[in-house]
Amino acid sequence: MTKKQHYLPQFYLKNFASDNGKIWTYDRYKGKIYACSPRDIACEKYLYETRWEDANPKLGEFVLPNQFENKFAEREGEYSKLLQKIIGLCSNEANKGALICNKDEKETLASFVSNMYLRNPWSMAQANLDCVTDGIMDVEEIKVIDNLLQLMEFGGTESLVKFASKRVWLDEDFDGSMQQESTKDLRGLKCCFIKTETKQFVTSSFPVLHGIDETTAEEEKIIYFPLHPHIALLYGNTLPHKVWNRIGVLPENDIDFWNKQYYKLEIDQVRFIYAKEKSVLEKLVK
């Protein structure tokens, strides 16, 4: 049973680590900048678990423990391999103008971005996954299950409902899940990889951003996700054809704009901002 469950995988965070393996972290709530290890950040105890409530103690503490953690782990090897390939290609000047991902890799990349968004505790809280919707216990099928569990002296019907809600949200293998639908939506957009030479991108405890501030047109879709201090991923429906699935060089002065987007969001959504170098955070927060 995994107690400390990461919502940002360590293979991703390590891309933003300094030479000593530490990540510079700005805690917006405390107003402090400090260095820490990737294994100690972006995690919560039993984040993806559902506790049995009003249930037979023989069932244990959690409903199907570690199921989501195991599913994430199955894909993270594939995600990590692709991410390192992208970083390697984008870092090589010889690949300027080259196509970065093939069809299967585009699918994997969209799955990864969706996973990063949906498994985040803020996203899960917005979806009320740990709440039983009013009236759902009156649904005939739920009543039948509840009666059966009571007869078997198991109980815990509401816990099963909560677990099912998480599966619909997180499970890529569940037909019609949010993970499936989000991946499909991203595949319907064009992507490009923006690169910076000297200034650095930051990332955060909520790295995937949908839409960029009030200047973004309502009909324009933009998804921003930093992959590395010098490489970020953009999805959109208005990207120029010449950068589709290719590298686009970002003017250095525009990097501050992207980094500041995290600082504009509420602290409960983005409490921590991460960077490879302390000076990048100091400039951002001053």
Please tell me what each predicted stretch does.
Residues 1-4, 8-286:
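Alpha-helical structural context detector biased toward long hydrophobic helices
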